[in-house]
UniProtKB/Swiss-Prot annotation:
Residues 656-725 are annotated as: Disordered. This is DEAD-box ATP-dependent RNA helicase 32. The gene is RH32. It comes from Arabidopsis thaliana (Mouse-ear cress). The Q motif is unique to and characteristic of the DEAD box family of RNA helicases and controls ATP binding and hydrolysis. InterPro entries: DEAD/DEAH_box_helicase_dom, Helicase_ATP-bd, Helicase_C-like, P-loop_NTPase, RNA-helicase_DEAD-box_CS, RNA_helicase_DEAD_Q_motif, SPB4-like_CTE.
Length: 739
């Protein structure tokens, strides 16, 4: 296809058409905007034969079609460029959340939207972004007009891809700012020219702090994707500084599957009369109806057996497995990978580099495999190919976490299945899920198909010693995650069979764990923390000293909370211990005595012939009754005698040292002389080869060389300085000097 070169007149006509289109869209939006608080879903869709947009009526003049409650993107008051992008991306029909949110967003209102996972929330804010900047005729010279904040890098990258698909016919510049990759300097150079920024909170704050003159005074719209997670305390230290640098007069859109309505959170964002859009609030279920959800009661020591058996019986499926900590992910992935279940295994967690995470993510999409992951994949991600199973080996922290996890399957009305493992002490989680309108069914395991993997893991730990440290960290971090959970009705470490759980990981001995109460001096409150001790049968019972070279390079603060973070004043340990979870049930060595740090220094003990201790100077004391008095004459004689011995020894030491240094200098001088002679010989050989030097010079050099060459031919004609005496070395050095 040949491109037609646009003339000046054509470009002018295009600008006029854009201005005319923008004016038409503004009139359309203003004339048919829904009332605040109105639910567009309560209206019926427009008839198929109804006219869209502007029309002329003889009685009322110019009228516009209604766009609230429509079900197709073509019926919205949006630009032709956006419609073309939607059509190329094969987006035709609108979902419920899109139909409810977009009409209010086009009017410039703040929105607080909640909808099920996989319901199309991304398009619900991407379209208003493009239209807002299009109506304002935004250009790269205007700077940043929109910021989209996502809690994870993968979700930000996915949103950036959708934005590029739909907005490819617009001329806006967009940038993706996420951590874990190189190119920060390049970002600093170009971030000022971006109109739309899709970013993670940490990277955006880094540019606000480090990039010169990076400001957003003309920001038009702010988007928080997975808003309940972004507003969580984990991102508070990053989000609050970001919000403080943004203008208050802006449009703000918040979207998530589980939304917050806390006044404090809304006040932080300066929302102005937001529209609360909860599409599925009145629905019978809180999860997609096409999702089949099951739960099994599995003891903690049987979880890996059950997981292994499940994988072996579903080799032709795409399975997403959630675990509590990244240490568990690492151990289960490495151990199962060595056992070769017959299906590709992948792992993904937050500490991996961004390139590696995206590579694993792409590989999981391409083929049927098992992906072990943490909650880093629990939110927002839309896999191009449907996930068949979501398996939650560990109980989620709350109902919201469960909904986000199972939301990775059964997206956009596709079929999906989920399986949740609960220990007997976590059965109350079923009641909480049912209260939240989650239709979950309790099933029993088929013990005939259960394959025990604990013995295989024990053999692996013997064969691969490095894997034992990974297993220990997985054991400890899992118990720590349970201990840190707030809902103590469900999560109780004391109700778990710790020794059996340790054996199920293949560990020969159970790591020792102790829980203590920590009191913060500044706040005056008790904080629960976990102190851990790992000991072998040969070791004495003492607190664990955490060092990276002992437990591996990947030991991180979040895995071992031995000490709380110090904020201002020192955090003191309470003398009272809650409990010792695992008592020492094996013979240990006696405790080593500690050195008394407060002992007096410089003390001296003198013993007599019978072994009794005396005063240091008692040997020179005068024998005069019971009183101890010093004999000055004997003391002076003693000092003179000792002084004479020291002076004599000092003279001998000086002689020995002088002789040693003299020999060292001689050896160095001989080496230097020998090196100089060899250099001269090489130069003479080169002169002889190149210009025919005289025989006299060659003879003199050969005679001189004979003088420094030893007669011992076994050494190859080299001087053996180690076998020569000092006198020989002096004589040889004197000859060299006279020459």
């Amino acid at each position: 296809m040949v491109k037609i070169k646009k003339t000046k007149g054509m470009r002018k006509q295009i600008r006029l058409n854009e201005v005319e289109e923008i004016n038409l869209l503004k009139q359309w939006i203003e004339s048919q905007k829904p009332d605040s608080g109105f639910n567009p879903l309560s209206l019926r869709p427009l008839p198929k034969d109804s006219k869209i947009g502007k029309s002329e009526d003889g009685k009322n003049g110019t009228v516009f079609s209604r766009y609230a409650g429509v079900r197709k993107f073509a019926q919205l008051p949006i630009s032709d460029k956006t419609k073309r992008g939607l059509k190329d991306a094969k987006y035709v029909d609108m979902t419920d959340v899109q139909s409810a949110a977009i009409p209010h967003a086009l009017c410039g209102r703040d929105i607080l939207g909640a909808a099920r996972t996989g319901s199309g929330k991304t398009l619900a804010f991407v379209i208003p972004i493009l239209e807002k900047l299009h109506r304002e005729r935004w250009s790269p010279e205007d700077g940043v007009g929109c910021i989209i904040i996502s809690p994870t890098r993968e979700l930000a990258a996915q949103t950036f891809g959708v934005l590029n698909k739909v907005g490819k016919f617009h001329k806006f510049s967009a940038g993706l700012l996420i951590g874990g990759r190189e190119g920060v300097d390049v970002e600093k150079e170009r971030v000022h020219e971006m109109n739309i920024l899709v970013c993670a909170p940490g990277r955006l704050l880094q540019h606000m702090d480090e990039t010169p003159n990076f400001e957003c005074p003309q920001l038009q719209i702010l988007i928080l994707d997975e808003a309940d997670r972004v507003l969580d305390s984990a991102f508070k230290g990053q989000l609050d500084p970001i919000i403080s640098q943004l203008p208050k007069h802006r449009q703000t859109l918040l979207f998530s599957a589980t939304q917050t309505k806390k006044v404090k959170d809304l006040a932080r964002l300066s929302l102005r009369d937001p529209e609360y859009i909860s599409v599925h609030a009145e629905a019978v279920t809180a999860t997609p109806t096409s999702l089949m959800q099951t739960v099994m009661i599995v003891p903690v020591e049987k979880k890996l057996d059950m997981l292994w058996s499940f994988i072996k019986t579903h080799l032709n499926s795409r399975i997403l497995v959630f675990l509590s900590t990244k240490k568990q992910v690492k151990f289960v992935h490495e151990a199962f990978n060595k056992l070769r279940p017959g299906i590709p295994l992948k792992s993904l967690h937050g500490k991996m580099s961004q390139e590696k995470r995206m590579g694993v993510y792409s590989q999981f999409i391409e083929r049927q495999s098992v992906l072990f992951c943490t909650d880093v994949l629990a939110r927002g991600l839309d896999f191009d190919k449907a996930v068949d199973w979501v398996v939650q080996v560990d109980c989620p922290e709350d109902v919201a976490s469960y909904i986000h996890r199972v939301g990775r399957t059964a997206r956009f009305y596709t079929q999906g299945k989920s399986l949740l493992f609960l220990t007997p002490s976590e059965e109350k989680m079923i009641e909480k899920l049912q209260e939240a309108k989650v239709p979950i069914k309790l099933i029993k395991a088929n013990n005939q198909k259960l394959q025990e993997v604990s013995r295989l893991l024990a053999a692996l730990l013997v064969k691969y010693p490095d894997l034992q440290g990974v297993a220990q960290r997985a054991f400890i971090t899992y118990l720590r995650s349970i201990h840190k959970r707030r809902d103590k009705e469900i999560f109780d470490v004391s109700k778990l069979s710790i020794e059996n759980f340790s054996a199920s990981l293949g560990l020969p001995m159970t790591p020792r764990i102790r829980f203590t109460n920590l009191k913060t001096k500044k706040k005056g409150v008790y904080e629960s923390s976990i102190a851990m001790e790992i000991e072998n049968a040969q070791e004495y019972e003492a607190p664990l000293v955490v060092k990276k070279d002992l437990l591996g390079e990947d030991l991180e603060e979040e895995d071992f909370a031995l000490k709380p973070r110090k904020e201002g004043k020192v955090v003191e340990k309470s003398t009272k211990e809650e409990e010792v979870l695992i008592p020492g049930n094996r013979v240990l060595k006696n405790k080593k005595l500690k050195i008394n740090l407060h002992r007096p220094f410089g003390s001296r003990v003198v013993l007599d012939e019978e072994g009794n201790s005396l005063a240091p100077l008692a040997s020179v004391a005068a024998e005069a009754g019971t009183e101890v008095a010093l004999d000055e004459e004997r003391m002076n004689d003693y000092y003179k005698k000792v002084g004479a011995e020291m002076r004599k020894a000092d003279i001998e030491d000086k002689k020995v040292d002088k002789e040693r240094r003299r020999e060292k200098r001689m050896k160095q001088k001989i080496k230097r002389k020998r090196g100089a002679m060899e250099d001269e010989e090489e130069e003479e050989e080169e002169d002889h080869d190149g210009s025919g030097s005289s025989d006299d010079e060659t003879g003199r050099n050969s005679k001189r060389a004979k003088k420094i060459v030893s007669d011992n031919e076994e050494n190859g004609g080299k001087i053996n300085t180690d076998s020569l005496s000092v006198a020989d070395l002096e004589e040889m050095a004197l000859k060299f000097i006279t020459q």
